Amino acid sequence: MEEFVRQCFNPMIVELAEKAMKEYGEDRKIETNKFAAICTHLEVCFMYSDFHFINEQGESIIVELDDPNALLKHRFEIIEGRDRTMAWTVVNSICNTTGAEKPKFLPDLYDYKENRFIEIGVTRREVHIYYLEKANKIKSEKTHIHIFSFTGEEMATKADYTLDEESRARIKTRLFTIRQEMASRGLWDSFVSPKEAKKQLKKDLKSQGQCAGSPTKVSRRTSPALRILEPMWMDSNPTATLRASFLKCPKK
């Protein structure tokens, strides 16, 4: 599974997932399913944010082509993928600036158009079950919840899906592709079932980490959201990481 993750996901996402697990004292070589789940969740968060901006008139727009003359504000602030200290610094800054209620738990994104924090969920189970678990944990109507599944289903607070249909379809397609790639290598069952995961771990240890099946073809194109996040992760100065509200649209 670890080898699959390294082949399937952008190296920057893999690095962020490794740092997140290390921060919580988790071993990616043992908890390989969790490693894969974190990478998947990170990618969905970045895809959620990609290409969505607010123009100078305050309108939400989608920009996929480079326009050097456009001064655009990112519609979504990415909180997921940062270390906890930096994440809370960003959340506090947002609350102080917008007057938003501070969440009890770290959310994944902040939507400047709708003025709300967003919790993104990616589940291998029934979407409504996972949605209820998230809602019971958060216990706040202020945080918007949006759940995606590997089967193409989704569920959101008050059926408000935030994004346009095409953007959501891009996320669903990526999740379905990940599922198919896992299944083709005999990894999907262990990813879904804890019992199967133990069996797979034994196989992985026996094979000394060798990946079954052929290498996964993966695009190395860096997500625009990752380009913004990378310098923030590396910079240890909290004040330097809070970027200016308006930025030029990043190159694709």
Curated annotation (Swiss-Prot):
Quote the InterPro entries the UniProt record gives: PA/PA-X (IPR001009), PA/PA-X_sf (IPR038372)
Q: Is Ion transport a UniProt keyword of this protein?
A: no
Q: Name one GO biological process term.
A: viral translational frameshifting
The catalytic residues are: E80, D108
A GO MF annotation of the entry reads:
RNA binding
The family annotation for this protein states: Belongs to the influenza viruses PA-X family.
The record's function comment reads: Plays a major role in the shutoff of the host protein expression by cleaving mRNAs probably via an endonuclease activity. This host shutoff allows the virus to escape from the host antiviral response. Hijacks host RNA splicing machinery to selectively target host RNAs containing introns for destruction. This may explain the preferential degradation of RNAs that have undergone co- or post-transcriptional processing.
What does UniProt say about this protein's domains? Answer: The probable endonuclease active site in the N-terminus and the basic amino acid cluster in the C-terminus are important for the shutoff activity. The C-terminus acts as a nuclear localization signal. The C-terminus is recruited to host protein complexes involved in nuclear Pol II RNA processing.
Q: What is this protein called?
A: Protein PA-X
Q: Which gene encodes it?
A: PA
